[in-house]
Amino acid sequence: EDAFPVTSCDCPDCRAACLNSPGWFMPEQIPALAEHLGVSVEKLFRGKLAVGVTCMPDGQQVHGVMPHKLRDGKKAGTVWTLLELADPGRCVFFDRGKCTIYKFRPYECARMMHDRPDEAVNLRHRIVPRWTTAALKEYGELVKGNLSTHQPNKKRRP
């Protein structure tokens, strides 16, 4: 049984998340979303997605892919810093109070736990290991940058 069951987005708290901080996809979800939208993964990434970053308990900053946040004129297909992610921004797929990709929404969004903050952190930590070097490779090439994966037992740099 999945420790993080799929939930409905039919409450104000879930919709508030769509206006602040979009959830992360699992790597295998992105090709399925691209196919559903009839575009290549590259076109989807450059037009609707972004690389997000999260900070692990050991201090490592690691990357994963999320919907682009509409804010400050920042372009899709780029990397968001922790500071940028701290400011609210509407998910590119949230329109007129609804998720336009509901059936294909990010893993994290489908399991939103706004009422259980500790579990929400555990949910993100479940997603992070799926963003391996291989899973991030294509997106790293598209943003022309080095993206970080979580490396347990790696010592934090001072």
Regions found by a protein language model. Give the residues of each.
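Short loop/turn segments that flank or connect secondary-structure elements
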Residues: E1-P158
